[in-house]
């Protein structure tokens, strides 16, 4: 009979989709962080439930050849890089396996080509955005990342997967906050001033934005702080204050104030320029997002007569990237500010054949159908929860030749593809793309074509 704090020798037989090792002992399935298949470990029992348990590695008996032994354990503890203990080659294989397994288990698909995961040459320092909590640790203001499954801050200076200029700026600002005695937020007591630092940097432009998230509007000696920052970092074109006085896990409150420079930064993707605000959705890995979108374009096999619906269009990054190659693009997005941004981005890039509406995709498609619009391709890029049944039915009712599915969750993609197959579409091919190296997240593009009946 197992008890808490027992130490048992186990072999890791599998990995969960989030990268925890799986071991089986005495009728329990145990989940163990930082353990890989094939490894034998001495495991300390942390928690027991009815037939599952949680353990931690007390000692490694046998190491996997797939282990990256150079990773700093801080990155694993914080969740910054929950796959960092795997070699990058192994990460790419595992991510492809996730896609293959989900398609088979959920949709019964085993005969469709799933390509090798497209990875990065240098799978570090890729994030163009950082959201960093500011807290007091051991009596001192610190910036860092939360310990996994907690709100305990681990102080970190090198975030491994963030742009190095962003890391430098965060450390510089942290030191200024200490010097000017600006108080960090205390979540339990609901006191303090500085909650988060949010930084964005244009991959191509190099322009930087810094956002101070504060509990109150007034920040003592903020002008002096800004002068020091802009002197040290000439690439900063925007400093914003966001006021969040609520007891919430949400980073931003409703009010934004521009303290210095512009409201936005500018960057480019696939040849188009985009204005990016503090709250804009913009892919955090520009290099791999360009590859992801190019694959979606290639799968869609577009030409100058193509009419394309861009569902979940955001600020227009997918639709505008191919708008000049096709006849018309119709984009729909539920967030009104994103739609306004998409319209501005179309105008900025001299694109006149892209039309954006703020609505649910189902409603927009029903209206477009009534107006006689017949798309050749519908490109979908839904959130992690995937597509709704009403969306799937509305998209099928428009009878496009192709549906190109850009997914950030292989489980919901497989579920949705199963439904599309029941409604007369067939999955032709899938390309996984690694937008988030060192983490468990995986994106992929799937091509569905209409079956002639």
Task: Walk through the language-model features, giving the residues of each.
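Short, solvent-exposed loop/turn elements at beta->coil junctions and helix N-caps
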Residues: 115-122, 187, 196, 200, ...
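Short, conserved phosphate/pyrophosphate- and ester-handling motifs at nucleotide-, phospho-/glycolipid
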Residues: 38, 162, 285
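Rossmann-like S-adenosyl-L-methionine
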Residues: 2-5, 9, 17, 217, ...
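Carbohydrate-binding surface patches
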Residues: 198-202, 208-218
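Terminal RNA-binding accessory module
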Residues: 1-74, 107, 355
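Extended interfacial segments that mediate partner engagement and assembly in macromolecular machines
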Residues: 61-71, 75-184, 204
């Amino acid at each position: 009979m197992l008890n808490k704090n027992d130490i048992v020798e186990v072999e890791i037989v599998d990995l969960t989709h989030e990268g925890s090792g799986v071991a089986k002992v005495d009728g329990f399935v145990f989940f163990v962080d930082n353990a890989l298949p094939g490894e034998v470990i001495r495991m300390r029992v942390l928690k027991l439930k009815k037939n599952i348990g949680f353990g931690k590695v007390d000692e490694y008996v046998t190491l996997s050849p797939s282990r990256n032994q150079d990773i700093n354990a801080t990155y694993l503890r914080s969740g910054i890089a929950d796959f960092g203990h795997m070699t990058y080659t192994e990460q790419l294989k595992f991510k492809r396996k996730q896609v293959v397994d989900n398609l088979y288990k959920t949709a019964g698909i085993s005969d469709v080509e799933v390509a090798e995961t497209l990875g990065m040459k240098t799978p570090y320092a890729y994030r163009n955005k950082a959201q960093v909590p500011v807290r007091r640790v051991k009596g001192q203001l610190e910036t860092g990342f939360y310990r996994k499954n907690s709100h305990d801050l681990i102080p970190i200076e090198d975030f491994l997967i963030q742009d190095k200029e962003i890391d430098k700026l965060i450390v510089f600002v942290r030191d200024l906050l200490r010097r000017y005695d600006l108080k960090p937020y205390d979540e339990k007591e609901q006191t303090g001033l500085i909650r988060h630092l949010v930084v964005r940097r244009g991959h191509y432009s190099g322009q930087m934005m810094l956002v101070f998230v504060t509990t109150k509007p007034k920040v003592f000696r903020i002008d002096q702080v800004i002068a020091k920052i802009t002197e040290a970092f000439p690439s900063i074109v925007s400093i914003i204050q966001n006021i969040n006085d609520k007891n919430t896990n949400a980073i931003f409150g409703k009010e934004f104030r521009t303290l210095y420079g512009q409201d936005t930064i500018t960057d480019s993707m696939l040849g188009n320029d985009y204005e990016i605000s503090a709250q804009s959705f913009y892919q955090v890995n520009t290099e791999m997002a360009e590859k992801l979108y190019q694959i979606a374009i290639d799968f869609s096999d577009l030409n100058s007569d193509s009419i394309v619906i861009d569902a979940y269009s955001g600020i227009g990054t997918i639709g505008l990237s191919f708008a000049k190659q096709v006849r018309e693009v119709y984009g729909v997005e539920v967030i009104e500010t994103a739609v306004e941004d998409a319209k501005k981005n179309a105008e900025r890039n001299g694109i006149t054949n892209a039309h954006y509406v703020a609505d649910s995709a189902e409603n927009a498609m029903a209206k477009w159908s009534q107006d006689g619009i017949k798309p050749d391709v519908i490109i979908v890029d839904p959130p992690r929860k995937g597509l709704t049944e009403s969306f799937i039915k509305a998209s099928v009712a428009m009878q496009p030749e192709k549906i190109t599915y850009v997914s950030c969750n292989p489980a919901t993609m497989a579920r949705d593809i199963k439904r599309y197959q029941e409604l007369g579409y067939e999955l032709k091919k899938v390309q996984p793309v690694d937008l988030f190296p060192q983490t468990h997240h995986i994106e992929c593009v799937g091509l569905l074509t209409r079956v002639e009946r």
